[in-house]
Amino acid sequence: MSKPHSEAGTAFIQTQQLHAAMADTFLEHMCRLDIDSPPITARNTGIICTIGPASRSVETLKEMIKSGMNVARLNFSHGTHEYHAETIKNVRTATESFASDPILYRPVAVALDTKGPEIRTGLIKGSGTAEVELKKGATLKITLDNAYMEKCDENILWLDYKNICKVVEVGSKIYVDDGLISLQVKQKGADFLVTEVENGGSLGSKKGVNLPGAAVDLPAVSEKDIQDLKFGVEQDVDMVFASFIRKASDVHEVRKVLGEKGKNIKIISKIENHEGVRRFDEILEASDGIMVARGDLGIEIPAEKVFLAQKMMIGRCNRAGKPVICATQMLESMIKKPRPTRAEGSDVANAVLDGADCIMLSGETAKGDYPLEAVRMQHLIAREAEAAIYHLQLFEELRRLAPITSDPTEATAVGAVEASFKCCSGAIIVLTKSGRSAHQVARYRPRAPIIAVTRNPQTARQAHLYRGIFPVLCKDPVQEAWAEDVDLRVNFAMNVGKARGFFKKGDVVIVLTGWRPGSGFTNTMRVVPVP
């Protein structure tokens, strides 16, 4: 390890970029960043992996959990309920295979990503994997005739939006597959369009279609979404990534479908078009969190403006204390190559520096050749980026923005984070039932990991959505005496932290506890040396 900074005492946790962290200005902070300064062992940013053919076997999933996966995402635009039920079973089998060692056990969350009001093409020549080449300048007929649903080729393309002929005009653009293929409408019929291929390429089955500027009148929650969400409730998923959310009422509709049985499922709204960005505040208010879905967003709004939307949304989520996920094309080239491009490395790091709580992999883990390498790469980049955050300014601003409150949990959380900076603590240990105490601490972005001890498995899994929370599940029976039960859980967290290298004997940790059993009573902060 490099030598700790003189002001830092002896806690080894604080060597990462400490010289820079002590800078007085942001520019000085940047000047002091040092590529030879090792980051800490803990990674604070969550990693969400899409599970698909390349990663759904129990063996691969075990390796992905070891490499750092926190949330498994299932994309319901593809696959049947049977297929997804099997994937969920595999994720849980892989997760529970580590259960014999409570110290190394990681609760992995399951996320259901809805198809949402999106438009997709049909199957190419009856196969999910076939592709055809579309040549620039060629004529492509778009049809609504179901006879072609599974018989698309380079001359005719079926898609599943029945009103397309009403909402596009001659001269309109149609984008397919994240905008890789663009078509221009030349002629309109009652149930077909004739288009010219402006930008060609190879087209696969069931690709997404975007109609920028068109007033697409699809319902927020389709019939398929209702079935999928009910399936998710039965399968006990932890969160829903709701696609193409355009306004707050869309979120309420998803909430209504989840119903009483699914009331604890977190709803993360995916912002993927202009209306969603424009009405961001009302959507944030209604949601449990936000996903910056840059794929569709980059077609619906100009590509050069996506970073503005990303920074604005991450900023507002950080201000509101709600989790935000950065997604799409983060390590895209790793689908086919073992190393990312330099631009992708920067992109992952900058998403973390912007303040994202989680970063996501899509095709990289679902269908790529290097799923494990992609997870490891995100893990390494995130850790380095977290060390380079200018906490001095960040904490100051978050604290200033927080409303004055008489809520003991809020006040204790701010105090704990402030104290953790002052004494360079190795971790902040929080005992939490509903997860709220841990979320409050995470909101102030401490440098040290937050070890959240809970007996509620769902609280543990959902905690991965928040930056910095390292959830651990306590399976020991509740002790009769409250004080003994507190000690039991704090010691459990100490053992986890030592085993994982977050801190060692002699370091200090901050411990947050309640004064009586139940939720909502966290009000005590202690500074404790590690035994």
Curated annotation (Swiss-Prot):
Source domain of life: Eukaryota
EC number, as in UniProt: 2.7.1.40, 2.7.11.1, 2.7.10.2
Gene3D superfamilies tied to this protein: Phosphoenolpyruvate-binding domains (3.20.20.60), PK beta-barrel domain-like (2.40.33.10), Pyruvate kinase, C-terminal domain (3.40.1380.20)
Cross-link (Glycyl lysine isopeptide (Lys-Gly) (interchain with G-Cter in SUMO1)): K166
Keyword tags: Acetylation, Allosteric enzyme, ATP-binding, Cytoplasm, Glycolysis, Hydroxylation, Isopeptide bond, Kinase, Magnesium, Metal-binding, Methylation, Nucleotide-binding, Nucleus, Phosphoprotein, Potassium, Pyruvate, S-nitrosylation, Transferase, Translation regulation, Ubl conjugation
Residues bearing the modification 4-hydroxyproline: P403, P408
Ligand binding (K(+)): N75, S77, D113, T114
Residues with the Phosphotyrosine modification: Y105, Y148, Y175
Ranges for region Intersubunit contact: 389-433
Annotated phenotype, changing R399E: Impaired homotetramerization, leading to homodimerization and subsequent activation of the protein kinase activity
Residues recorded with modification S-nitrosocysteine: C423, C424
Activity at various pH: Optimum pH for T3 binding is 6.0-6.5. Increase in pH causes T3 binding to drop, does not bind T3 above pH 9.0 or below pH 5.0.
Effect in UniProt of substituting K433R: Abolished acetylation by EP300. Abolished deacetylation by SIRT6
Its biological purpose: Catalyzes the final rate-limiting step of glycolysis by mediating the transfer of a phosphoryl group from phosphoenolpyruvate (PEP) to ADP, generating ATP. The ratio between the highly active tetrameric form and nearly inactive dimeric form determines whether glucose carbons are channeled to biosynthetic processes or used for glycolytic ATP production. The transition between the 2 forms contributes to the control of glycolysis and is important for tumor cell proliferation and survival.
Family: Belongs to the pyruvate kinase family.
Name the UniProt record assigns to this protein: Pyruvate kinase PKM
Organism: Homo sapiens (Human)
Lineage per the UniProt record: Eukaryota, Metazoa, Chordata, Craniata, Vertebrata
